[in-house]
Amino acid sequence: MEQDDRLLNAMFEMCNHKNPLNDGQREWHIADIPGLLREERYDELDERYNQALTESFTSREAEKRYFFAWNQMDNPFYDMDTLVEAGPQGLALIKNWQRARPRSTHAWLAEAQYWNHRAWLYRSYGWARETTRAMWICAAACNERMVIAALNAIDCEPRQWMAAALTSTNSKVFGQPGWLVEFLVGADVAGQPLMEDLAEYHRHSPQEVDALMAHSGLSFADAVCPNLPRPSVLPECNDDAGQKYWLAVCLAIFPTAFYVLDEYIPFCMPRWRGSHEEIREFLESSVCDHLSAAEREHLELLIWWDDHRDLRIKEVDSPAEQERIIAKAEEISLRAHIQESRHNALKWLRVCYSDLDDNDALWRTLQRSIVEKVKFNNYFFDDTIKFALRDFPDTLWMYNFLCQNAQQTEFAVPKIRRGYFQYAGLLGFEKDEAQGLAWLDSVADIQYNHNWRAAIKNFNWFGLPEHFVPLAELGAQRNIPAALNLLGLEHNNKENNGLLPYDPAIALGYFQRAAEILHRQLALRESTPYKLIDNGGYTDYENDLQNIHFSIGVCNQRLSKQEPDTEKRSAYEKELLDNLWLAHQ
């Protein structure tokens, strides 16, 4: 009952109180690293991050801020993301920082994180089933560069725990350099060859390796191990410099750390060749004595999450077992002390209730997710709008929901809807065309093509067809193929129920523009050999092109039938046949 009252009060507040307009600022942001590096403001960078590092030892909130400013895992909004995406240009900025401030712990941490993230981009996220041998070798070379940078970072003052945390995870995924144990037990490894596997592969496939190395800035000029520091904080190494060793390094610097354990545990799961039993033993060990009861509960619940994150409720045959699983998830979502545990349970429950077509339970879970500030993916975002238009019309609820979910989200549909409604001055937003267009421009890229399609089409599903064409036109102005295609389909609708006047000539123009953009994108893709694996975004170029060429064929057929000029009619008929052929390729 108390939970029900809390939910009702929260929904009442969303309906009747207008929160301040937000601007998309990142939650854990410490500094604009690329911007400050371009301006060579190295002292300011060091001051900001040294202060954040010092504060990270004093409270969990400060520790969390520092951790998420530097860690990219399930965190697309950390401070280094644009620097890593810049590839060799970003690396060059980091190297300039190191040359200007050779004892800057954060200049070295930046390089460690650069190579960490680039290693993951070579591997790809998920199960890495499409990762090639050359990509794995490049990832290992990045990992080697990361370890060198991490040792330098840890050797500097103030003492750096984050570099060891990143290295712990990477050593589980990419292994450890062959020379590392030798170095840690006291040998001098300066001058030893690095990247030997990459050099060997390069002899057999130079074009492939050169193309892959160019993504990150890997270079055979760095193929010899430099003189490495021996930070005094490094513990004794017993023939294994892997995940556990680097966790020990981290805890030697920061004995009461929590967030590094929150990342460490998932990489001890069976999917990473570990076991739940090993995790339970670890949580009972003295390493975890400093944890609070709530923190220990959260780490234990990661085992539940590992068991259930990929489980679909309809895969469970027994109704009694289904009820038990749902009840446990509900309990976690209500009772878990740490927000991330509640988030995991709520994310699972909304998929569960969607699969069961239990709309009442789904809507209740979505509302609770809003209260808990869970970020909604594109699918559940639009589900929520559908329910809210039914239950909370003519209130401030939609405005508050749009603001909350467009903030620091990796999903494009919330940004599109936020931008459109602010541009148009609807659903509680004051009309601000400039700010609205800025939100739309942030996702005005072909990789979001499928998101624009859903955002436009779902206006009909919402019962708001009057917004279909205005948003499609804004998308067309940004050369979004899906928007152009949808406008073409409306103009090519002969049934008098289209949102635009029937005119196959206008429709043809939209279809041709969409096809031209998609063909250009396909040509670009084919002209770029040895691309990295795309872990998301729009990839259905061929299927969409087939459908568009079919629509172009239909337009030409209709235009030929109404064309009195024989020569023009013949040209339309030829275009009809050509596009029907392309539609079946």
Regions found by a protein language model. Name each.
Residues 31, 35-101, 113-253, 261-292, ...:
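Short coil/linker segments at helix-helix boundaries
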Residues 94, 143, 150, 247, ...:
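Hydrophobic/aromatic packing residues within the alpha-helices of TPR/SEL1-like helical repeat arrays
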Residues 103-104, 159, 256-257, 341, ...:
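Short helix-capping/linker turns of helical repeat alpha-solenoids
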Residues 107, 162-163, 260, 296, ...:
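TPR alpha-solenoid repeat register
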Residues 109, 116, 165, 262, ...:
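TPR/TPR-like alpha-solenoid signature
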